[in-house]
Structures are given as structure tokens and as C-alpha cells.
Amino acid sequence: MQSYLGKLIQHEAAGGVLLVIAAAIAMVLANSPAYDFYNGLLEIPVSIRFGAFEIAKPLLLWVNDGLMAIFFFLVGLEVKREVLGGQLSSVSQITLPAVAAIAGIVFPALIYVWFNIDDPVAVNGWAIPSATDIAFAVGVFTIFGKFLPLSLKLFLLSVAIFDDIGAIVIIALFYSQDLSTTSLIVACAGFVALFLLNRFNVRRQAAYVLIGVVVWAAVLKSGVHATLAGFALAWFIPLKLKNEDGHPMLPHLEHKLHPWVGFVVLPIFAFANAGVSLFGASISDLLNPITLGIAVGLFVGKQLGIFGVCWITVKTGLAKLPDGSTWVQLYGVSLLCGIGFTMSLFIGSLAFEEQGLAYQTSVKAGVLLGSLVSAVLGAVLLARSNAKSKERAEREAARDA
């Protein structure tokens, strides 16, 4: 378990660096003479047709509906593994990160609603600041917290997992469109087929993948957001059953997908969604209630919810601090949870899908501002604590020598 988490954290850290690079390139293109090229690239129409069945979308929506389904599939695999035998398999292990994640969803949403309560359209984006970008958060932690307790990293990962579950529930309940009964029936039939594959110990991964693609397409056509199909499909992948090559199926898929998601899927998503054009925009244009609600929700709401509820939970004896950690270190992690970036941008694209460029620009500005401030202050705080931990470790090593 420890070695797996170490590899996971390394992947997430390197992926976080790529996310920064991809987002920076998008910002440069969106604010340069290459803006038309950047925007035109995202609007390229792409269609897939099988007989009378057709899916036609601009490239941007293929990224958001297709590639992000792979990301949520990986999240589902991680959650299933942790629930069945990992960090989320017992009440004592999940109490603190679970209540922290719930508070980290509720408090930012309340702050956003407070800023936008008088605008019935804008208030639909209440869930945008509720998300945490696990790749960015773990990346910053790994860079600036090398000598901090491993338990603190596990706490951050667990909070992020619960946060992802919350985001999935929110998308399912609040950001799905008018439903198509026929498509839902096809999707349900696909899930039944996957259950039977699992029940009869079918070892061929290709069978699961083929049915999974059909389910994704059916869910996409049904009006339920297609990324939810990715998360649901993961729960039909056997945990211990070995595939045709002799590898346990779920861990094998998880291992294979991690580099693709971290180094391809999420950087492409960041490139496609982070380009905020500031041409002709004034400070007052950017600091509107949507932008402020998101930025303040991410920076203030996340840390207030997570740290505040953790303090109450620990002081009342319902849980304890991660082993070897301090309140200052936990506060630093709470700040990192305010890095919403990819997940916040994704929810923003759903919340204001029909509202046009102005709303999306406000969303992107708020997400980037709140995430940047949270990342910088969290990194500074953890770096100072990390330096003290390093000095302590060096003194102990010298004493032992």
C-alpha cells in the first residue's frame, strides 16, 4: 500500500507540473495574436457515425465529455480499491477526511451563493468552487512537503477522493439535461452485461472495454453527463480476478491508466479550458460576482470548511490528527484543497454551458485566481514547516550517527 501510494503521489506531482505548463500555454495563446487559432482549434467539428447513430461535437466538448470520462473512470477504480481494502475501508480511517471533504464542498458553495444570490443565472454555478484538483494539490505538496509526514499526504488524497465523489453526485443531480428513456435503457442493459461478465469471471479486458464504450455513448445521448458513465463503469471491473495476461484486472487497469490520465488527459483538458482572453477586459469586468464568488469560495471557503471542521472533530474526540502532523501542517493542506483548477473549470463548463463566452471567462478568471492564491500560500506555509521537519530529521540522523 505504501509503495503504491508513493508511485501515485509521484505521478500526481509530475502531472501537476504538466498541468501548469499546459494552462500557461493556453493563457499565452488566448492573449496573443494566436487567439483565433486557439479558439478555432477548440471549435473544430468532430463526428463519429455508426449507421444511423452519430455523435457530432466540437473538439472542446470531445475533451470535456470523452477524455474526462477516462479521468472519472480512473477515479472510480481508485475509490473502489480504497473502499474494499484501502484507506477508506474502515470508519476510523474515513471519519476525518470524510467530514473535511463535506465541509470543503458546503462552505465554498455558500460563499458563492452569497455573492450571486440576486442573479438566478449566476447562482447556478454554486458548485464550481467546491472542487479540488488532486493533481495540482498533491503536486504542490510533494514539491514543498518532502519531509512532512506521509499520513498528511494520505489525508490529502483521501479528502480529494471524497471530494471527487461529491463532484460526481453534484453533476448527476444538478447538471444533467433532459433525459432520453431509450438511451438510458441501452445504458442499463450495458451495465447488466458488465455485471454478468463480472459474475461469470470473464477475464478478457477487451469485453469490458467494448461494453464500456457502448455504455458511455448511451449515457452521452441520454442527457446524463457522460463522465458519470466512466465512474460507474469502474465499479464493474473485478478487483482480484486476473485478466488473460495473469494480472489482477483492477490494479492492472489503474496502473496502465495513471500515466495516460496524468500526462495526457488532464494536460489536454487544462489546455482546452484554461485559456482566458483578457483583451479589452478591465479589472471591474473580471471582478464580478461570479469571479469573486469562485475565487473567495476556493480560497476562504475551502480552508474555513476543511480546517474548521477538522478542528471541531478532533477537539470533540471523534477523530484524531494524521499521525505525526501538526495543526499548522493541516492548515497548509486545507489551503491546498482550495486549488480547484481542472475540476472547477469542468463544473463551470457544465453550469454555464448555454450562457456564452462572458460567463466562461468569469469562471476561468475566478478559478485561476482562487487556485493560484491557495497554491502560493499553501506552498509557503508547507515549505516553512517542511524546513523545520528537515532540520529535525538531520539532527536526529546526526545524533544516531
From Swiss-Prot:
Coiled coil: none
Keywords for the protein's UniProt record, in alphabetical order: Antiport, Cell inner membrane, Cell membrane, Ion transport, Membrane, Sodium, Sodium transport, Transmembrane, Transmembrane helix, Transport
Main location: membrane
InterPro entries in the record: Na/H_antiporter_dom_sf, NhaA
GO biological-process terms attached to the record: regulation of pH
Membrane topology designation: Multi-pass membrane protein
Bilayer-spanning residue ranges: 13-33, 59-79, 94-114, 125-145, 154-174, 178-198, 209-229, 260-280, 292-312, 332-352, 363-383
Localization per Swiss-Prot or TrEMBL: Cell inner membrane
Cellular component terms (Gene Ontology): plasma membrane
Reactions catalysed according to its record: Na(+)(in) + 2 H(+)(out) = Na(+)(out) + 2 H(+)(in)
UniProt GO MF annotations: sodium:proton antiporter activity
Sequence similarity: Belongs to the NhaA Na(+)/H(+) (TC 2.A.33) antiporter family.
PANTHER family named in the record: NA(+)_H(+) ANTIPORTER NHAA, SODIUM ION/PROTON ANTIPORTER NHAA-RELATED
Function according to Swiss-Prot or TrEMBL: Na(+)/H(+) antiporter that extrudes sodium in exchange for external protons.
Descriptive protein name: Na(+)/H(+) antiporter NhaA 2
Organism: Pseudoalteromonas atlantica (strain T6c / ATCC BAA-1087)
Gene this protein is translated from: nhaA2
